[in-house]
Amino acid sequence: MSFKLFIKNLPTNLCCGLIHIYRWTISPLLGSPCRFFPTCSQYALQALKHHGCIKGLGLTIKRIGKCGPWHPGGVDLVPMTTLEEALDISPAVDDDESCDLHA
């Protein structure tokens, strides 16, 4: 990986690292299951991987804002990018999805 690519992906990878820390430390203490599929932390990792740091964080904040008794939950997938829509590719739902960006 080039240094330029490393710097470009650094904010996204830092955010993903923070989400993994949350999943390993705080999430097990909460004990209550997420009302959505994929879970909010899985959603955040996917949003960051597919849309980058700024838009991914925006989508994540919007998703967390839905969390509460006023929303029924259910399936709420990360919106696709234009290229994914054109190729009809849906985002993969993977419990251990990383944010390693190689593009």
UniProtKB/Swiss-Prot annotation:
The keyword Transmembrane helix does not apply. It comes from Chlamydia caviae (strain ATCC VR-813 / DSM 19441 / 03DC25 / GPIC) (Chlamydophila caviae). Could be involved in insertion of integral membrane proteins into the membrane. Pfam families: YidD. It is found in: Cell inner membrane. It comes from the Bacteria. GO terms for cellular component: plasma membrane. This is Putative membrane protein insertion efficiency factor. Keywords: Cell inner membrane, Cell membrane, Membrane. Its main location: membrane.
